[in-house]
């Protein structure tokens, strides 16, 4: 293989600001330290470790609301600690950026939860504080509990959410 045709492999860690992400119940294991997800030191240590390991980035997934799709209730998610409770992942990034130089930060943020102006302000601030090391996973939300948490009667239909997202992105580009 010629040097020009070689492709780079990018390595990231996939996290969530919750007791567990895709490994529901692991928080019960005595050696699991994700139970410290609510402490800044946990995230700073993770960022330092990722940078020492030469990873390219830390991606923090997020979902607004508690999983209420299994049996129409949040009981199963809450019992297993499955992505609940969750913290706002954007608030963790500046602490991780402070203790690293090269790691990139990706974060999920829903267009359904913020006004475009406040969203642009928050993400522009993070982009500056990280020296341009911020990426955004754009989502529109999909949990009824998230919609109810925002005072809505129900989650908007899929196509309507994406129509709103298109308008939202148009507004963001102008800001």
What are these regions (language model features)?
Residues 54, 101, 130-132:
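Active-site-proximal glycine-rich helix-loop-beta segment
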Residues 61, 108-109:
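Short His-Asn-centered micro-motif
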């Amino acid at each position: 293989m010629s040097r020009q045709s070689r492709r780079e492999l990018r390595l990231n860690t996939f996290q969530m600001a919750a007791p567990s992400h895709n490994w529901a119940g692991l928080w019960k294991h005595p050696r699991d330290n994700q139970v410290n997800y609510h402490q800044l030191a946990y995230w700073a240590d993770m960022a330092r470790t990722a940078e020492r390991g030469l990873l390219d980035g830390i991606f923090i997934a997020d979902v607004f609301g508690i999983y209420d799709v299994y049996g129409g209730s949040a009981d199963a998610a809450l019992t297993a600690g499955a992505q609940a409770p969750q913290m706002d992942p954007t608030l963790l990034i500046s602490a991780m950026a402070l203790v690293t130089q090269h790691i990139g930060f990706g974060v999920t943020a829903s267009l359904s939860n913020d006004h475009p102006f406040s969203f642009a302000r928050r993400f522009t601030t993070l982009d500056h504080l990280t020296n341009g090391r911020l990426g955004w996973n754009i989502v529109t939300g999909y949990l009824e509990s998230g919609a109810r948490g925002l005072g809505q009667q129900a989650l908007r239909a899929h196509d309507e959410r994406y129509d709103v997202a298109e308008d939202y992105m148009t507004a963001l580009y102008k800001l």
